Curated annotation (Swiss-Prot):
Its cofactor is Zn(2+). It is found in: Cytoplasm. It comes from Pseudomonas putida (strain W619). This is Acetyl-coenzyme A carboxylase carboxyl transferase subunit beta. Pathway: Lipid metabolism; malonyl-CoA biosynthesis; malonyl-CoA from acetyl-CoA: step 1/1. The keyword Oxidoreductase does not apply.
Length: 297
């Protein structure tokens, strides 16, 4: 019996353990909406949109920019800027410790990435919020990176697009963070005066000081399907007004129906549809027209 254990059973158990450990971690992902178990490589092909229920999962700022801009000719704006704990703020944890933790978790210095590049050949500037960095909250660095992106658009007379995903102003920066609402709104007013298009794309979620400033100041405001958009959360509103809110309240579909946003576009359609829209707004050829002209020539 002892020989059987040594020769047969133990090697069998060891082989089983090796097989289990050889399966890469994160190969499968459960959809938070329909709970379907999805194969990660297949999910990446659909841009993190569930093929079963069309739920648009949250994605990082760099991933969003990677799938939106053309691959060539990109340049990051304001990458050298880093947050500073000027107020020595502390709640349950020191602000500087929260920053270090968020930077380690995301690999980013702060919650906004701005980049110049092209969209189907058209020069453009893009900003995208990183929600995983302290809830995409807006502080001094976020505001300054946004302003630098807008100034680049002004100097080069090219359109700007911002993908918002934020819980609002960063409370750890107090009045400094609130000032960013005015700062970003002011530079967008300059874009409008110069006739340079600004498109705001609202992704899940957009709340607080970001929704009350730059996110709602687009010449065209686009929402991703079923994105949560508002100032205060629905639970807070219900507790305040002591009434049951309508079904789907603060979802992008509800806002479209009531005229608060202009369009809802699925993630996979953002590139071609926004390219056509910007071509029309700037008087350029659409990508389709450019291809047709090249084919005729």
């Amino acid at each position: 019996m002892s020989n059987w254990l040594v020769d047969k059973l133990i090697p069998s158990i060891m082989r089983s353990e090796v097989k289990k450990s050889s399966v890469p971690e994160g190969l499968w992902h459960k959809c938070p909406a329909c709970e379907a178990v999805l194969y990660r490589p297949e999910l990446e092909k659909t841009l993190d949109v569930c093929p079963k229920c069309n739920h648009h999962m949250r994605i990082g700022a760099r991933q969003r920019i990677d799938i939106f801009l053309d691959a060539e000719g990109r340049a990051e704006l304001g990458a050298e800027l880093e947050p500073v704990d000027r107020l020595k703020f502390r709640d349950g944890k020191k602000y500087k410790d929260r920053l270090v933790g968020a930077q380690k978790q995301t690999g980013e210095k702060d919650a906004l990435i701005s980049m110049s590049g092209t969209l189907m050949g058209m020069p453009i500037v893009v900003s995208a919020f990183e929600f995983s960095f302290m809830g995409g909250s807006m502080g001094a660095v976020v505001g300054e990176r946004f302003v630098r992106a807008a100034n680049h658009a002004l100097e080069n007379r090219c359109p700007m697009i911002c993908f918002s995903a934020s819980g609002g102003a960063r409370m750890q920066e107090a009045l400094i963070s609130l000032m960013q609402m005015a700062k970003t709104s002011a530079v967008l007013a300059r874009l409008r005066e110069e006739g340079i298009p600004f498109i705001s794309v609202l992704t899940d979620p957009v709340y607080g000081g970001v929704s009350a400033s730059l996110a709602m100041l687009g010449d065209v405001i686009v929402g991703e399907p079923k994105a949560l958009i508002g100032f205060a959360g629905p639970r807070v509103i219900e507790q305040t007004v002591r009434e049951k809110l309508p079904e789907g309240f603060q979802r992008s579909e509800f806002l479209l129906e009531h005229g608060a946003i202009d369009l809802i576009i699925s993630r996979g359609e953002l590139r071609p549809r926004l390219a056509r829209l910007l071509a029309q707004m700037t008087g350029q050829e659409t990508p389709e027209q450019a291809r047709e002209a090249a084919a005729v020539a």
